[in-house]
């Protein structure tokens, strides 16, 4: 996090944006080559050939709070295996892998290739966001995900996502020598719930879930987060989980970071609010939607419990999945859908 904060301050616009894939995005980069050098030096760019396809979501609280299984060890194992498979460099940049610990929080992102725990060491194979009916032992998970992704590379003819390929999941399973099953399909969740606030871990320590207005983490706040020197998890809800804290330390973290903009209140309207980049960052936008949304929240016109996405045009970039109220700017003002 120290390296990211320094890069944002020295080479970007002074902040970072958290994305719905748990990634970190820089804007207004003055020297892309220097940025790449810094991130590589910090170990954040381990592969020049596979960087665009290392999109792996995992249940953020896995192994610490709730869940059916602990998927933490599967994350680096899958990442290393993807990078070691030359053919997977040809996956589209929109490809998404997911490792769900059974609570259904990341499978709702409709990954191309994923698993969801159905027991402590048993998983459902998920393709294009749907349960195939195939069940795997934990020892099979990484190999089967690699096989399914490799099959997509060989089958695709320009499709960005497996869901865009005609009969994609069935064809992938056929190439893997597996058959889909209609038995015991997992329920389909509508949306994940961001972990916000004080979260007691199974070992008695504390995780703190902190949201950020508009998913924006400024460099100064990032430096303070890094100084905590505890494991950090970037979630697909544009928030951060600070893990493995003793109670006293957790209380001090809240006292310091809350006034700096980290949101630990699960009732904050910012939990449900998102926006595209808007004007002046996007030429297609009809309004400065981020400022307008910030003003609306400050005025108390937006309440917790209704998900809203503010967009500067009909493209609605950055819109989250699920049931969302769209507030869309046009030439004559905003429309609500």
Predicted segments, located by residue:
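Small-residue-enriched alpha-helical segments and adjacent helix-cap loops
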Residues: 1-126, 131, 135-139, 143, ...
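An acidic, glycine-/histidine-flanked metal-binding catalytic module
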Residues: 116-193, 223, 337
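Extended macromolecule-engaging scaffold surfaces
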Residues: 176-234
């Amino acid at each position: 996090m120290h390296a990211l904060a320094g890069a944002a301050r020295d080479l970007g616009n002074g902040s970072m944006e958290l994305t719905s894939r748990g990634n970190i995005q820089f804007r207004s980069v003055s020297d892309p080559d220097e940025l790449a050098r810094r991130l590589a030096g910090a170990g954040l760019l381990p592969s020049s050939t596979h960087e665009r396809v290392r999109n792996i979501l995992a249940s953020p609280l896995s192994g610490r709070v709730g869940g059916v299984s602990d998927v933490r060890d599967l994350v680096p194992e899958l990442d290393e295996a993807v990078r070691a498979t030359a053919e997977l460099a040809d996956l589209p940049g929109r490809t998404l892998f997911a490792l769900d610990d059974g609570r259904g929080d990341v499978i709702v992102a409709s990954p191309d290739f994923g698993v969801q725990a159905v027991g402590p060491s048993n998983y459902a194979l998920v393709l294009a966001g749907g349960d195939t009916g195939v069940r795997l032992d934990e020892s099979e998970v990484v190999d089967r995900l690699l096989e399914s992704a490799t099959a997509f590379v060989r089958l695709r003819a320009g499709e960005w996502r497996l869901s865009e390929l005609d009969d994609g999941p069935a064809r992938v399973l056929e190439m893997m020598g597996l058959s889909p099953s209609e038995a015991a399909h997992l329920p389909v969740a509508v949306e994940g719930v961001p972990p916000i606030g004080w979260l007691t871990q199974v070992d008695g320590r504390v995780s703190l879930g902190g949201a950020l207005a508009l998913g924006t983490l400024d460099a100064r706040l990032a430096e303070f987060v890094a100084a905590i020197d505890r494991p950090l998890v970037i979630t697909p809800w544009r928030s951060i989980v600070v893990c493995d804290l003793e109670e006293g330390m957790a209380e001090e973290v809240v006292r310091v970071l809350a006034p700096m903009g980290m949101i630990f209140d699960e009732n904050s309207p910012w939990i449900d609010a998102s926006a595209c980049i808007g004007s002046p960052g996007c030429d297609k936008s009809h309004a400065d939607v981020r400022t307008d949304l910030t003003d609306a929240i400050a005025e108390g016109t937006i309440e917790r419990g209704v998900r809203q996405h503010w967009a500067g045009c009909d493209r609605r970039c950055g819109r989250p999945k699920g049931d969302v109220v769209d507030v869309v700017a046009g030439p004559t003002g905003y429309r609500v859908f």
